């Protein structure tokens, strides 16, 4: 029986028949990653757009101890499985659903390089962008211009690292030279036009990064995930 995404009891206990991704209106940079991959692979999935109070419920806390989105429920050998890290979701989903390994490596060396850049996003670019936004939203005495400037400078360093990497001969994509992978999907939401514009960073300063971003934005699954951003509306979840 399919999971009922409008029932907290079902979401807490039942086994889905396809991946279910929890998302939230507004900041999309993490939760859009698994959705881009699922769209690129043309895998059927469901999404539940939840509000802030829902993330603090007992059932969601059991699913995601840090109470963030994305979180994911899926089925594996008839058993309910879950994940609550966007990079881990990319690895899990590509390993399970990408039989042709279009978005993953074809050997150990390729997988290692892809994981290098997944880690770059998880440990560097993503957290830096997150805390830049946190400081940018502070008001009055909570403002810390020095800390915010530090985050901004660090972001420019990280974009510079990406730009230099992509400027190497034949390096059309982040993880591998010849094709986009889950590493590109992990990094793109923190280097798309709206995000960099919000941070006051001109993409013209990073021409290779700009060219890569424009190319990835035209990948059909990526374009579809972004086109549907505004359609993700909060749902009411009952008992």
Swiss-Prot record:
Q: Which Pfam families does the UniProt entry name for this protein? A: GST_C, GST_N_2
Organism per entry: Clonostachys rogersoniana
**Under what name is this protein listed?**
Glutathione S-transferase verG
Which InterPro entries does its entry note?
A: Glutathione-S-Trfase_C-like (IPR010987), Glutathione-S-Trfase_C_sf (IPR036282), Glutathione_S-Trfase (IPR040079), Glutathione_S-Trfase_N (IPR004045), GST_C (IPR004046), Thioredoxin-like_sf (IPR036249)
Gene field? verG
Q: Quick one: which pathway?
A: Mycotoxin biosynthesis
List the induction conditions: Expression is regulated by the cluster-specific regulator verZ.
Q: What is its EC number?
A: 2.5.1.18
Q: Which domain of life is it from?
A: Eukaryota
Name the Gene3D superfamilies on file: 1.20.1050.130
What task does this protein carry out? Glutathione S-transferase; part of the gene cluster that mediates the biosynthesis of 11'-deoxyverticillin A, one of the dimeric epipolythiodioxopiperazines (ETPs) from the verticillin family that act as mycotoxins. 11'-deoxyverticillin A is required for normal conidiation. The nonribosomal peptide synthetase verP is speculated to be responsible for condensation of amino acids to form the carbon skeleton of verticillin, whereas the cluster-specific tailoring enzymes are involved in further modifications leading to the production of 11'-deoxyverticillin A.
Q: Which residues does the UniProt record annotate as the domain GST C-terminal?
A: 107-237
Q: Which family would the database say this protein is a member of?
A: Belongs to the GST superfamily.
- Provide the GST N-terminal domain boundaries: 18-101
GO MF, one example: glutathione transferase activity
Which key words tag this protein in UniProt?
Transferase
Consequence of gene disruption: Completely abolishes the 11'-deoxyverticillin A production.
Substrates-to-products reaction catalysed:
RX + glutathione = an S-substituted glutathione + a halide anion + H(+)
């Amino acid at each position: 029986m399919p999971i009922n995404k409008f029932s907290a009891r079902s979401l807490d206990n039942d086994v889905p028949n396809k991946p279910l991704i929890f998302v939230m209106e507004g900041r999309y940079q993490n939760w859009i990653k698994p959705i881009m991959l699922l769209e690129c692979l043309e895998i059927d999935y469901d999404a539940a757009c939840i509000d802030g109070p829902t993330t603090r419920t007992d059932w969601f806390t059991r699913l995601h101890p840090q109470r963030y989105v994305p979180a994911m429920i899926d089925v594996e050998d008839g058993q309910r499985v879950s994940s609550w890290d966007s990079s881990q979701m990319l690895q899990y989903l590509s390993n399970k659903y990408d039989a042709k390994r279009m978005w993953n490596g074809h050997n150990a060396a390729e997988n290692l390089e892809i994981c290098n850049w997944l880690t770059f996003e998880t440990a560097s670019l993503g957290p830096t962008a997150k805390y830049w936004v946190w400081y940018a939203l502070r008001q009055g005495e909570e403002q810390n211009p020095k800390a915010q400037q530090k985050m901004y400078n660090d972001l420019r360093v990280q974009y510079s690292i990406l730009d230099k990497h992509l400027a190497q001969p034949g390096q059309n994509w982040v993880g591998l030279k010849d094709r986009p992978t889950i590493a590109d999907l992990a990094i793109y939401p923190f280097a798309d036009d709206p995000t960099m514009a919000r941070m006051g960073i001109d993409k013209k300063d990073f021409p290779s990064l700009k060219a890569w971003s424009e190319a990835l934005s035209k990948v059909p699954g990526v374009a579809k995930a972004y086109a549907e951003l505004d359609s993700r509306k909060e749902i009411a979840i009952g008992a």
